[in-house]
Amino acid sequence: MSEKGRLFTSESVTEGHPDKICDAISDSVLDALLAADPRSRVAVETLVTTGQVHVVGEVTTSAKEAFADITNTVRARILEIGYDSSDKGFDGATCGVNIGIGAQSPDIAQGVDTAHEARVEGAADPLDSQGAGDQGLMFGYAINATPELMPLPIALAHRLSRRLTEVRKNGVLPYLRPDGKTQVTIAYEDNVPVQLDTVVISTQHAADIDLEKTLDPDIREKVLNTVLDDLAHETLDASTVRVLVNPTGKFVLGGPMGDAGLTGRKIIVDTYGGWARHGGGAFSGKDPSKVDRSAAYAMRWVAKNVVAAGLAERVEVQVAYAIGKAAPVGLFVETFGTETEDPVKIEKAIGEVFDLRPGAIIRDLNLLRPIYAPTAAYGHFGRTDVELPWEQLDKVDDLKRAI
């Protein structure tokens, strides 16, 4: 333990980070297919490297025009991120785009289309007919540390990353380039955030920028101070924060020219910044029949409503599935001693209020829509800039009644 207290760190990255370019492409392809055919089955993985994009995976869809237009969808998203010139290391208009997509395996499709409950047990409920697209375990988490009920380190790291992109795109700091990362270290006493210890901001920039005279003061004033003023956290002292701006020095070579990128390689950034556990499954490029995505969203929905209902100050919930089965094989609730009701009662109430069969999750959260591209950067949970169905607090009263 540090003399400053217990130090916890989370990181975020901007939409121009190579891995996030891949997440954005995968989710843009998903959205394009869902917009034309909401029943599309999509599992799309992307790789980017110098001058090249490779999009592979499995898709079953009736959206023939959207499928044929995937190359243009890829290029449009890269350009929207800001890679529009070889001077920035990547150009969506001229990069090579290779598509290698096949159909979903019929062996997987049979378990999703006709779940074990319907196929073997003769269940008549339509929601018993859609099985989980894979086995796996998914976690959801919520904590009353911020208005969005997220851990403070990841919430602050995401705000800094979003602000980096804002000042680049709106011309406040036009010399910034799309690639960037942020990291936040916060000191805790008795699980209360008391001091902002260290902030690291690394951002790609134009070659002719003086780091000490221009970049460092601009980032402090236009990015960090703006975010901290907006945050205005009650218990967090930011007066002595150590700020490290581009601690390696210049950062001109970035994006896919600096590092290759892959879909699904920022799963901790996507979720809770390491503060809560993770089941291991990535989100981007997957349609909601994949419980890696839809069930993780559902568990965030569960956790957030439990905390908002005042049943616990923080809660972590786990659900698990067997491939081809509709009903979860496991549900686990951890309240870390912060509960205001018996944890057994909380778990029972969750089971009564939330239907965690994949078909029910898709129905209740209305997931067969093109809503996924905005989630590809800056986190899937606790977003303050976009409205997402799994962030709604619509089950608070139901949980209170069930208790």
Swiss-Prot record:
Enumerate the residues binding K(+).
45
* One protein family per Pfam: S-AdoMet_synt_M
Required cofactor(s)? Mg(2+); K(+)
Q: Which residues bind ATP?
A: 17, 179-181, 250-251, 259, 265-266, 282, 286
> Which pathway or pathways does this protein act in?
Amino-acid biosynthesis; S-adenosyl-L-methionine biosynthesis; S-adenosyl-L-methionine from L-methionine: step 1/1
Record NCBIfam families: metK
Q: How does it assemble?
A: Homotetramer; dimer of dimers.
Give a short account of what the protein does: Catalyzes the formation of S-adenosylmethionine (AdoMet) from methionine and ATP. The overall synthetic reaction is composed of two sequential steps, AdoMet formation and the subsequent tripolyphosphate hydrolysis which occurs prior to release of AdoMet from the enzyme.
What's the protein name? S-adenosylmethionine synthase
Query: In which organism is this protein found?
Result: Mycobacterium bovis (strain BCG / Pasteur 1173P2)
Classification lineage: Bacteria, Bacillati, Actinomycetota, Actinomycetes, Mycobacteriales
Q: Which gene encodes it?
A: metK
